[in-house]
Amino acid sequence: MGKDLRIKSKAFDGTMRAPNRAMLRAVGLTDEDFKKPMIGVASTWAEVTPCNIHLNDLALLAKKGVRHSDAVPLVFNTITVSDGISMGTQGMNYSLPSRDLIADSIETVVGAENLDGLVAIGACDKNIPGCLIAIANAGVPSVFVYGGTIAPGNVDGKDIDIVSVFEGVGQHNAGAIDDNQLRKVECNACPGAGACGGMYTANTMASAAEALGISLPGSSSNPAESEEKQGDVEAAGEAIKDLLEKGIYPKDILTKKAFENAITVVMALGGSTNAILHLLAVSHAAEVDLTIDDFNRIQKKVPHLADLKPSGRFVMQDLHRVGGVQAVMKLLHENGYLHGDCLTVTGKTIAENLAEAPALKENQQVIMPFDNPKREDGPLIVLKGNLSPTGAVAKVSGVKVKRHTGPARVFNTEKEATQAILDNKIKEGDVLVIRYVGPKGGPGMPEMLSVSSILVGKGMGESVALLTDGRFSGGTHGLVVGHISPEAQDGGPIAFLQEGDMVTIDSNKREISMDVSEDEIKLRQGKWEAPELHKKGVLGKYAHNVTCSSKGAVTDYLNRE
């Protein structure tokens, strides 16, 4: 008899556990199965979003892979929230909390059912960090599988995507397109299954997962509706058995060096600002000492190479065609930007995996060369100053303005700010501020894609700065600063900003400040009262437990310092 690979399901051995086994027999387990490791297949399948509509089929393929490796697969589901569908509505308040709900629910099932390993399948934005947090907390050998990117839509021979529709709303308001043109974009932007197609949050976090080594090589850029994606999930199911045999756990993979690799890849690809929030949260679960300042440290050294949307020309499917994320990682590793000695779910190191990976195709245009990058350093920067002492996040790729000073136009809700833009009350040079939308204040730190896209659609993407203690979608571009912390709800300086105060954003100095004296800030602070927190349900629990964005907006910080 071979080595017993069961880590936790040994708990079902013996006469005292006959009742437990009786219930497992009812779902199909046999005497032989009780000798094998039990592997959970966590799926975020749902019909509420195109990102996840195909995941049930992928879960069944993962189940097949687990069974093929002579282990016992047990499929279970968790929730998903569509950022794109909830955007601009009250539903967006539930988006970030869903990350932690996903993580908690997967960890709960793995723990409660005494599972020995895990294949976690996610697609939409919060699925991916939710799955990674669960993997880190559950602690059993695990592989993450990305559901894959959507294909681009097409109108009149031009590729479009979901952000084209958001920006179309602004173009429509400005009179640049009519009702029929907007409808044409709406009806053709999303042609099938898969996550939003640019280097937005889902594709960013999938790429980060591959760079971390917690997903299989090549899997982050394989499209949702492809044979390669089907192969990814079946191979992931088979890989778990190998991890069990070699005794490789998430803690062996999710190291400080691995997170530095992930940040490097995100910077090179021009990823979403949400990557900072999510990688901080995943590192917290993995008990890795990663801080918001690590992002600036790496940002200064890593060039932005990918000409991907939202600031570039191409989408993830185009990157797949020229070699995918593995080819980009190979290029980065060959030029000394990655730690090659990090362990991965293949049982090999990053360097060993990349030695077998193909290089980028010749004459491709998606990834720019080191001697002519899109930007000489990374596009995600952390700003600090008297408006955000513990850090704010900006994405500066494609933004020509390096310094902007203007009068604050202050709003306490996204709805009010949006209406002001549509009513042409926001002028060039203004600094549009949306506050009380942070993790606690929102609650849920909603994304401001609708607002930023309307500004871009109206031609004001670089003439009006947008600041918030909320978040931005990975599809956002323009002169935007989010994650301002401490947030207004916590009494951060943004709460004391008043209409007309002059605000300066300086990306070169990495500073964000208001031209208000310390004495005046203290005077305003003395008159300020915190609004009441949300009281009930999911959002109430979230508001009372979540930390600030500069710590990843996690809900289990507890007594850790």
Curated annotation (Swiss-Prot):
GO terms for MF: 2 iron, 2 sulfur cluster binding; dihydroxy-acid dehydratase activity; magnesium ion binding
Residue numbers carrying N6-carboxylysine: 126
Catalysed reaction, written as an equation: (2R)-2,3-dihydroxy-3-methylbutanoate = 3-methyl-2-oxobutanoate + H2O; (2R,3R)-2,3-dihydroxy-3-methylpentanoate = (S)-3-methyl-2-oxopentanoate + H2O
Any Pfam family: ILVD_EDD_N
Binding site for Mg(2+): 83, 125-126, 447
Pathway assigned in UniProt: Amino-acid biosynthesis; L-isoleucine biosynthesis; L-isoleucine from 2-oxobutanoate: step 3/4; Amino-acid biosynthesis; L-valine biosynthesis; L-valine from pyruvate: step 3/4
GO biological process: isoleucine biosynthetic process; L-valine biosynthetic process
Enzyme kind, highest EC tier: lyase
Organism domain of life: Bacteria
Cofactor(s), by name: [2Fe-2S] cluster; Mg(2+)
Subunit structure: Homodimer.
Membership in a protein family: Belongs to the IlvD/Edd family.
Protein role: Functions in the biosynthesis of branched-chain amino acids. Catalyzes the dehydration of (2R,3R)-2,3-dihydroxy-3-methylpentanoate (2,3-dihydroxy-3-methylvalerate) into 2-oxo-3-methylpentanoate (2-oxo-3-methylvalerate) and of (2R)-2,3-dihydroxy-3-methylbutanoate (2,3-dihydroxyisovalerate) into 2-oxo-3-methylbutanoate (2-oxoisovalerate), the penultimate precursor to L-isoleucine and L-valine, respectively.
Protein's name according to its UniProt entry: Dihydroxy-acid dehydratase
Organism: Oceanobacillus iheyensis (strain DSM 14371 / CIP 107618 / JCM 11309 / KCTC 3954 / HTE831)
Primary gene name: ilvD
